């Protein structure tokens, strides 16, 4: 899709032979290509200071991993933007990979995933959360840099409205049809 839109991109993953991976890495470092679509293995050992974007298509397995991977962006002091796409099904998929591991390892893996999911779903300053996770404190309430600080979510109390909806569903014994009608704009 990227190449079809004239973006110079290349894949990088374990399924490629080492010569192809090496060529892709060199092309990226020498700026012959602009985008690498890669597994997490690509970022390890790459020291390219002017990376501007790190995009996760799946949720990372841990906050340590996320921090390491997103740390590739903006190393030169320029802007670095990190985007993580995340859905609950990602957690279920990662939990499934842990099923045949020893129980203690499963417990640790689940804890790491829960911490990563909490980070992804939180409305708290991301810098504050990461620093706290790594044992440091950040006294400011707003870093003026992360998505939560730049675009705070408005919170509303919806308990009463939700109770009305649940009572309505119970009243029709969950056997209903829904018709949505939106009147045309004048």
Show which residues each predicted segment covers.
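A general alpha-helix detector
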Residues: 50, 93-97, 112-116, 129, ...
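Generic alpha-helical segment signature
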Residues: 59, 75, 84-87, 106-109, ...
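A conserved SF2-helicase RecA2
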Residues: 91-123
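Cys/His-rich short segments
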Residues: 125-162
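Positively charged, polyanion-binding regions of nucleic-acid-associated proteins
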Residues: 159-176
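Helicase motor core with emphasis on the C-terminal RecA-like subdomain
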Residues: 1-100
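Conserved small/polar residues in nucleotide/adenosyl-binding loops
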Residues: 181-186
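Generic recognition of stable, solvent-exposed alpha-helical segments in well-folded globular domains
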Residues: 65, 108-111, 125, 160-164
